[in-house]
């Protein structure tokens, strides 16, 4: 354990076993407190421990908001880890004690504060569309945002009885920026004549009009204005034929006013960058991999726009010099957590661990659903939650096997939100290295699915294969 802590583990009303012996073997030096219903009937036990000033790790994430309220009263240092869906709710729960101990120990590894950059939005919004649907969306937002509607094909568009927001015509030729700082270039730009009667009639048009806005709502039905459009903060896109999707985008746009703290996902040391010297281009890895085009050449090095960066981490994973480093968490902290997870699992009696790397929104949700509606994870599948699976580089994969992993699986979406070329390149580089040290076969692979039951079907096969290899000559 990184420091002496009190571990609170709960059987959740006897729906999962608690292997006390495994916790004692794996979490030496920690005070282990077990319960049956710590969030309700035994809540005062939790409160008294928090008042005592103990550092506490609670094996429950479902009731974390309640426990945080109590911790705030006493200023207690508390962290949380999911051992129920990750281990306890499983067809192999009886053998999951070592995994539970490993998950709790890894959760106690101290995490550094997340660095942030601030984004300001004054609520100036442009609704870009092709017909009345854009006007309807603008009308829903007019009381909340400073709205302008830009229509690409304003044929037979009824003039409003009262001009409550500007309606102009034009086609966006180019767009750049992000929440609070969009810049668009519009061709065929024109304003309507105030004398328009049966339909809006527009004045003389011009190309190259420039406009700035904080929020860009795109209901044009055309191609996205940005690469990896779903990752561009402040750019909301919906199919104009899907009223529910348009309404959802409107509701999201309404909330994008004020100051926002965005994580600074990547740290960058320009002096280490090998992009260019004497006007001769050397390394382009990050430029070629960035899905949002947040990276651009800047002389002998590159520059990363932290407000556009969506945090995929492929630049840091591919950087050959360490100029770009991932910050959520930094690589050395992730290594400590990985080492703790695998060594405690072994110390607690676990064998043949399969490291299951996943993000929270997708992989975490699949694991949760598999536990609730399927057989749960195998006892030797150790989930490691990271910010983005694509942040994983060769050093993490090598460390996982060095610390004792029998296999590594990376959970990905069936339809990724951005190109995964960087991750695939890392896997292709790692495979011959693993084979060279005798780790051949399906040691490293992705599981690309949005179906929790498909995840469940993939993992037991992996578990059986790795166990059979370990038992072989």
Kindly label every feature range from the protein language model.
Residues 2-289, 293, 352-368, 384, ...:
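Ferredoxin-type iron-sulfur electron-transfer modules and their immediate structural context
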Residues 393, 399-410, 416-437:
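C-terminal, active-site-flanking charged/polar segments
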Residues 167-169, 338-342, 347-350, 426-434:
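Short, structured secondary-structure boundary patches
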Residues 308:
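Active-site phosphate/pyrophosphate-binding segments
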Residues 118, 249-252, 271, 275, ...:
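Flanking helices and flexible, charged tails adjoining ferredoxin-like Fe-S electron-transfer domains
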Residues 153-176, 184, 320-324, 329, ...:
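Structured core of small recognition/catalytic domains
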Residues 50, 142-146, 281-305, 314-333:
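Iron-sulfur cluster-binding cysteine motifs and their immediate structural context
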Residues 77, 147, 325, 406-407:
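Residue-level detector of anion-binding/catalytic polar loops
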């Amino acid at each position: 354990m990184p420091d002496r802590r009190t571990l609170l583990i709960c059987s959740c009303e006897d729906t999962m076993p608690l292997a006390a012996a495994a916790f004692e073997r794996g979490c030496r030096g920690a005070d282990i407190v077990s319960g049956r219903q710590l969030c309700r009937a035994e809540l005062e036990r939790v409160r008294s421990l928090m008042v005592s000033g103990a550092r506490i790790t609670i094996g429950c994430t479902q009731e974390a908001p309640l426990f945080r309220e109590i911790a705030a009263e006493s200023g207690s240092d508390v962290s949380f880890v999911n051992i129920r869906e990750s281990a306890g709710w499983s067809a192999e729960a009886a053998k999951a004690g070592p995994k539970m101990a490993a998950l709790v120990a890894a959760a106690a590894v101290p995490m550094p504060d997340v660095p942030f950059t601030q984004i300001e939005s004054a609520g100036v919004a442009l609704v870009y569309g092709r017909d009345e649907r854009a006007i309807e969306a603008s009308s829903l937002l007019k009381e909340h945002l400073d709205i302008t509607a830009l229509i690409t094909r304003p044929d037979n568009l009824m003039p409003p009885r009262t001009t409550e927001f500007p309606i102009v015509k034009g086609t966006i030729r180019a767009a750049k920026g992000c929440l609070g700082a969009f810049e668009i270039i519009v061709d065929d730009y024109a304003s309507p004549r105030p004398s328009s009667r049966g339909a809006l009639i527009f004045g003389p048009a011009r190309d190259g009009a420039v406009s700035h806005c904080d929020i860009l709502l795109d209901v044009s039905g055309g191609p996205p204005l940005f690469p990896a459009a779903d990752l561009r903060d402040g750019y909301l896109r919906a199919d104009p034929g899907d009223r529910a999707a348009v309404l959802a985008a409107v509701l999201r746009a309404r909330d994008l006013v004020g100051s926002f703290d965005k994580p600074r996902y990547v740290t960058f040391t320009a002096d280490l960058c090998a992009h260019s010297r004497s006007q001769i281009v050397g390394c382009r890895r990050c430029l070629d991999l960035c899905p949002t085009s947040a990276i651009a050449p800047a002389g002998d090095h590159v520059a990363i726009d932290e407000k556009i960066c969506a945090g995929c981490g492929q630049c840091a994973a591919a950087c050959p010099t360490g100029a770009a480093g991932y910050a959520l968490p930094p690589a050395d902290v992730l290594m400590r957590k990985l080492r703790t997870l695998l060594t405690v699992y072994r110390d607690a009696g676990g064998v043949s661990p399969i490291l299951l790397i996943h993000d929270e929104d997708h992989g975490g949700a699949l694991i949760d659903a598999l536990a609730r509606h399927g057989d749960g994870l195998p006892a030797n599948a150790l989930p490691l939650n990271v910010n983005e699976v694509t942040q994983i580089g060769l050093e993490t994969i090598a460390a996982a096997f060095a610390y004792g992993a029998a296999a590594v699986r990376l959970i990905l979406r069936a339809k990724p939100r951005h190109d995964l070329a960087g991750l695939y390149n890392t896997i292709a580089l790692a495979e011959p290295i693993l084979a060279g040290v005798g780790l051949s076969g399906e040691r490293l692979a992705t599981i690309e699915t949005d179906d929790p039951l498909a995840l469940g079907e993939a993992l037991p096969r992996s578990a059986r294969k790795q166990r059979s290899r370990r038992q072989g000559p």
